[in-house]
Amino acid sequence: MHHYVLLFRTTRTITAEEQKQRIADISAWIKQVADMGVSLDPHTLEETVLAIPAEGAQTSGHPDSTLSNFVMFDATRDQAIQIARLHPAPRYGVSVELREWTAPRPLAPRP
C-alpha cells in the first residue's frame, strides 16, 4: 500500500443539471471505491487568496484552471490508477491528476 492523492482542477462552470448528475455520478464512484476496500479522505479548497508566480510578481487569484479539491487515500498502484480512471470529473470539465505522496521527514533534533 502507498499513499495517493487525486488533485482536481476545475476548467469550467457546470450547469445546474450537470451539478445534479455529477452528485449522483460521484456517489456511485465513492461506492465503487468503497467496494474495492479503499477509504477516501476528501478535501475542498476555497478560492485562491494569493498566488506568487516563479518570477516573483504577486497576483490575486489564479488565471489558469483552479485546484478545487483533493482526495487522499491508501491503495496499491493498480487500485490508485483504477480509482483515478473511474472518477467522473472529466465529464464535467474537471481534470484529475493522480500522485503518490510521502509524509515529510521529521526535523533533526536541535543540539
Regions found by a protein language model. Give the residues of each.
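Conserved, structured core segments of small domains
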Residues: M1-P111
